[in-house]
């Protein structure tokens, strides 16, 4: 029996009017088209919207952090200096940015001033006196610390008496109050632990806790409204704690630097006897621990890196990194390669730690790579040739030096004195670095200030 041939040709689609089968096929074709064009259903849930926004913000934040980190890595090699002329002021010890164009500074000659980085204009700010200003004026100390509270509405610094704490209101710099009954020696460092509470560290080995209450602020406003002469309150300390004293050298237990960890409410303190102290700092000060530093000479600066949960301590030639959660023998230290001049200032910005030295150098340490940033090869005409692999180092300008009797008798045969970087600070954008200081020898009178951008 012969097999019936089967055609492999497809049948032509039926016309629209060909009956129910044709309608089914046509319906099937439309359904296929519909399936191809179908989009995900729109979720109108508030929870879904918030989660989607959170993911988007996380991506944007991650990208922003990468961008800021890259900028922090590349910026130091691009910075150029512009010096400011400060007249006859002596050694800038402290500085903070007030806004995008103003920096407030304190000097060894006890002068508080604001410099406009765009116009170079200098404006001096009246310093605040004790309620009983009959004490002997202390020479050679000055203003060692300036700190802004977290909301940037109050500024804390030293007073006319370097043992006292002075509080100003921002942005007007109107006086608010003076804490003048706490320390018996100079204030070396200040740290805000909240918007209204600050801690001062003194050369007498004590730490004072001060509170600027709403009552003090209200009365300050009322006084300013009725008087054109600056009037301010006088406050007393809320707590006064002595740091532990080493038996072998009790006279050198001077609180030199403070740094606050806002996440854990912990306050780090460095004393000149070579110890790091950690305190719980909320409504009072409670000691948590004390540990001997691996390099214990000239420990004069301290900074806290919140992202890395470590404190950076400067010494005569090293920067040491302390994590209070780790044993003391795990402390890592790096050498600045400028022995003898000392680390005078230190700060965190992103993953870069900026180090200011007594030789007028700025060094940049990458905490992720655990090494200093290095020079790039430069082929610019007329520039000093630099070897690849050398640490990137920026050097401060000439500044001003008073050729007084001390200079004539002891230093006149020396052609040039580097300006120690006693203070430096980045602006909010991280693209401008204010640097200031003066000659390292205590007997020399001079100053330096510059904007690196």
Curated annotation (Swiss-Prot):
Residues 1-12 have a biased composition (Basic residues). It is found in: Cytoplasm; Cytoplasm, Cytoskeleton, Microtubule organizing center, Centrosome; Nucleus. GO terms for biological process: protein ubiquitination; regulation of autophagy; ubiquitin-dependent protein catabolic process via the C-end degron rule pathway. Keywords: Cytoplasm, Cytoskeleton, Nucleus, Phosphoprotein, Repeat, Ubl conjugation pathway, WD repeat. It comes from the Eukaryota. One of its GO terms (molecular function) is ubiquitin-like ligase-substrate adaptor activity. SMART domains: WD40. Coiled coil: none annotated. Residues 1-38 are annotated as: Required for nuclear location and interaction with MOV10. PROSITE patterns: WD_REPEATS_1, WD_REPEATS_2, WD_REPEATS_REGION. GO terms for cellular component: centrosome; Cul4-RING E3 ubiquitin ligase complex; cytoplasm; nucleus. Residues 1-26 are annotated as: Disordered. Pathway: Protein modification; protein ubiquitination. The modification Phosphoserine is found at residue 15. WD repeats lie at residues 138-178, 182-220, 250-289, 338-375. InterPro entries: Beta-prop_DCAF12 (IPR056151), DCAF12 (IPR051191), WD40/YVTN_repeat-like_dom_sf (IPR015943), WD40_repeat_CS (IPR019775), WD40_repeat_dom_sf (IPR036322), WD40_rpt (IPR001680). Substrate-recognition component of a DCX (DDB1-CUL4-X-box) E3 ubiquitin-protein ligase complex of the DesCEND (destruction via C-end degrons) pathway, which recognizes a C-degron located at the extreme C terminus of target proteins, leading to their ubiquitination and degradation. The C-degron recognized by the DesCEND pathway is usually a motif of less than ten residues and can be present in full-length proteins, truncated proteins or proteolytically cleaved forms. Belongs to the WD repeat DCAF12 family. Component of the DCX(DCAF12) E3 ubiquitin ligase complex, at least composed of CUL4 (CUL4A or CUL4B), DDB1, DCAF12 and RBX1. This is DDB1- and CUL4-associated factor 12. It comes from Macaca fascicularis.
